[in-house]
Structures are given as C-alpha cells and as structure tokens.
C-alpha cells in the first residue's frame, strides 16, 4: 500500500492529468485514509468505513485517466470495471459479485509478485541448476557443471536449445469450457475450468524444447512458486483485498433507470440494487474463500449527460457520500494536455516520427491552433473532451505519417497555417459529420 501523502499523490497525478484539482484531492485523501486506518488499534479500526466517491463530469475530462494513474499509485488491489457489464442476479450475464472475485484475483497476483521477489535469489539458483541438468545431465562431474555454469553466467549458451519440463500455466483439461453468458465459468465459489483441469491431471507438464535465454523466466517463476506457501499467500491476499481493496466503477450513469421505461430493467435498476449490499458491506463467496467488502473503497464515475445523479437509487446515492464535479476543459487546458504532461500527445507524436528519421517541429501558434480547433469542433458537434485532440492531431500529421518512410532526415515545421490548412475540411463539415457513422 502506498505511503504517499495527499500532496504527493496530487503532484504525481499532475504529471499526467491537467486540471481537475477537486477530483485529485478527493481521491488523494481517500487513498491516504486507507493508510491512516491501518495505524489505528483495537475495535475503532473496524468501525472506520471508507468514504466512497462519486465523480461527475463530461466525457473526456479525465475521470477514467485518474483511475488509470491511481491504479499504479495505489500499491493495493485495484480493479476498474464498467457498470454496464453487469446484469441483475438471476439473469444470464455477470452479476456484481464478480467484481469482488476479480479483485481477489488481482490481490493474489500482487501478493504472489511480492512473495516471488522475496525468494528470487533461491529461485534463480534452482532454475540455473535445472538448466545445467538439461545441458550436461544430472550425473555430470562437478568440474563439468562448474565449467558450464561459468559459460551460462557469461551468456555464452543463450542460443542453445534445451529440453525442459514446465508446469502448465493454467488448467489444460477443458480450456474452452464456459457457461453461456458467464465468462470464466465462475459459479459462486467454484471455478469449473479449474475443477475439470485438476480432475483430468492438468497440472502435469510436458517436455518442451526452448532456448536457454527463454527458459530462465518461466523456470524462475515455477521455482518461486514452489518456495511459496499457496495457502498463506491466499490468506494474505484476501486480507489485503478486505483492508485496502479499491474498485473504480466507471459509467455508473448508464445504469440509471430511464423514465417511461416499463418491464424488467435487468442491466439498470436491478444492478443498482445488487450494488447496494456490496458497497455497504457484505460477504462474497469466492473460490478462495469468503471475502468481506466492508472496507473496500468504491469510486464511481459517470458523465450524466442524459441522466442526473439524483436518478440513481436514493440508497445508492447515500452510499457514495463524497461528490466531486469535474470541470469541462478549456483552450488553455487543451494546450497543457498537448505539451505539459509527462507523456503528452505532442511528445508521443514527435517520438513516433523520430523512429523514421523525421523531426517534427511544432511552433507555439501550432499548439494554440490545435487546441482552438479541438474546442471549436467539440462545440459544434458532440463534446468528447480531450479525446477530440487525438482526432485533430491525427488529421494534421496524416500526410507526414504516410510519407515518413521516404522523408528520412527531414525536419518538418508545423505552424498554425499548416494546422488550419489540414483541418479546414474537418472544421467546415462538422455539421455534416454527425450523420456519418
């Protein structure tokens, strides 16, 4: 779990996301509160519940990007899901409890990586011994083994092929077996693929011919897993999920009930009702054991173009007490997105063209023109926020990108005139573009 202060979390998010100070502060405080709760002792620690967040803002303003960056910062089990992927319990499709099951798998993956790091030195030594056995045989003299060990460590044998037996990475018995409408064939606490794989002896490895260089990584992973206690790992992962798990629930506005709609709302209000106990705190059965959701942090987000936050069930609104409104992006914000962030669109475009030997030189007025065209098009057609910049920028560099292979060594200046010339038809035909698929 991260030990960053709220100020450090915000400044880390600032490297990649422009504006939206309120949203950054809210998620930073929520993330820090996870650490603060861990410092409490006794029964009070169990009483402190996470303050779930509802982020409201137009499309393309940074909601999903905040989630992506937060996942890397969290250092805890983190899962991003779309609310539209779930259906009400009892109907064909994924029910919301699958969120917790998926989060547990993420937690086990994170914990396994930590455990593997702890035993890496022993695993590397064991992997080296197995490769030596494959090269010279287990009965070779110590002198021969040492000679080959030296060559192995000097990378002299990397291209040599050896035959080794690797355990399969997943169940081999029935790899394609799924229940219709239920990806992963996961029913409550039982995973059918795992069950059938074990019953049919799916854990037995087959000999494979592979180069020495390619053999190292799977062998180290396999030897690490032998040194790790799976039961203890699972218990630790579940504890980590229960105490520090974070779920980012995107597109929550798409499950608001539509007015005037009759009949069963399998993917809308029913899903909201199913989310209530999950967010409030319940126990979900998984194949690894029961998981309590009382202290899992839920961050929901939506554009709310058609619906309003008040269209959500009142009980669900009450379970998302912290509301943050993200602001629409301005011309200045667009200019910052193009140039100021760590992996800005201009930096990406310049780097891509440099691979062909073409140097792009964007002037200040070109950046300004790109930002203004994006705002104009957003205003006249559908406002898709920062995503519009990609459309405009691709149109501007389309010709250069197509002919880059033949222009190696050239420097191409891009100014406001060049931008306007390339996007003239885009800006002129915006009123027609809404009718084009």
Curated annotation (Swiss-Prot):
Its main location: cytoplasm. ATP binds at residues 18, 60-65, 250, 315, 387. It holds the Pfam family AAA_2. CDD domains: RecA-like_HslU (cd19498). It comes from the Bacteria. GO terms for cellular component: HslUV protease complex. The keyword DNA-binding does not apply. Keywords: ATP-binding, Chaperone, Cytoplasm, Nucleotide-binding, Stress response. Belongs to the ClpX chaperone family. HslU subfamily. NCBIfam families: hslU, PRK05201.1. ATPase subunit of a proteasome-like degradation complex; this subunit has chaperone activity. The binding of ATP and its subsequent hydrolysis by HslU are essential for unfolding of protein substrates subsequently hydrolyzed by HslV. HslU recognizes the N-terminal part of its protein substrates and unfolds these before they are guided to HslV for hydrolysis. This is ATP-dependent protease ATPase subunit HslU. It comes from Methylorubrum populi (strain ATCC BAA-705 / NCIMB 13946 / BJ001) (Methylobacterium populi). The gene is hslU.
């Amino acid at each position: 779990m991260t030990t960053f202060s709220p100020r450090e979390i915000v400044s880390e998010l600032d490297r990649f996301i422009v504006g939206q100070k309120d949203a950054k502060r809210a998620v930073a405080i929520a993330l820090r509160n996870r650490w603060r709760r861990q410092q409490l002792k006794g029964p009070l620690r169990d009483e402190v519940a996470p303050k779930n967040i509802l982020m409201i803002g137009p499309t393309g303003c940074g909601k999903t990007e905040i989630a992506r960056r937060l996942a890397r910062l969290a250092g805890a089990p983190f899962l991003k899901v779309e609310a539209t992927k779930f259906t009400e319990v009892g109907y064909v499709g994924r029910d919301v409890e699958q969120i917790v099951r998926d989060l547990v798998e993420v937690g086990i993956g994170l914990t396994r990586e930590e455990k593997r790091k702890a035993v890496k030195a022993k695993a590397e030594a064991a992997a080296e011994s197995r490769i030596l056995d494959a090269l010279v045989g287990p009965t070779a003299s110590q002198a021969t083994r040492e000679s080959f060990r030296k060559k192995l460590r000097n990378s002299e044998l990397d291209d040599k092929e050896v035959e080794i037996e690797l355990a399969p990475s997943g169940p081999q018995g029935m790899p394609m077996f799924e229940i219709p409408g239920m990806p992963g064939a996961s029913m409550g606490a039982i995973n059918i693929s795992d069950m059938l794989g074990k019953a049919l002896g799916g854990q037995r490895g087959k000999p494979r011919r592979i180069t020495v260089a390619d053999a190292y990584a799977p062998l180290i992973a396999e030897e690490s897993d032998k040194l790790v206690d799976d039961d203890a790992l699972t218990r630790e992962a579940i504890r980590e999920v229960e105490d520090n798990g974070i779920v980012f629930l995107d597109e929550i506005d798409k499950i608001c009930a539509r007015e005037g709609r009759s009949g069963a709302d399998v993917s809308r209000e029913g899903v909201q009702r199913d989310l209530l106990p999950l967010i409030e705190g319940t126990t979900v059965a998984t194949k690894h054991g029961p998981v309590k959701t009382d202290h899992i942090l839920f961050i929901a987000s939506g554009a709310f173009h058609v619906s309003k936050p008040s269209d959500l069930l009142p009980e669900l609104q009450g379970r998302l007490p912290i509301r943050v409104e993200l602001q629409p992006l301005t011309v200045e914000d667009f200019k910052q997105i193009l140039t100021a962030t760590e992996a800005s669109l201009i930096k990406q475009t310049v780097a891509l063209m440099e691979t062909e030997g073409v140097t792009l030189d964007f002037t200040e007025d070109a950046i300004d023109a790109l930002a203004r065209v994006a705002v104009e098009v957003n205003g006249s057609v559908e406002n898709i926020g920062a995503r519009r910049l990609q459309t405009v920028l691709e149109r501007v560099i389309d010709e250069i990108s197509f002919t880059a292979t033949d222009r190696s060594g050239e420097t191409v200046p891009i100014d406001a005139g060049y931008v306007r010339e390339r996007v003239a038809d885009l800006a002129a035909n915006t009123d027609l573009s809404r009718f084009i698929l």
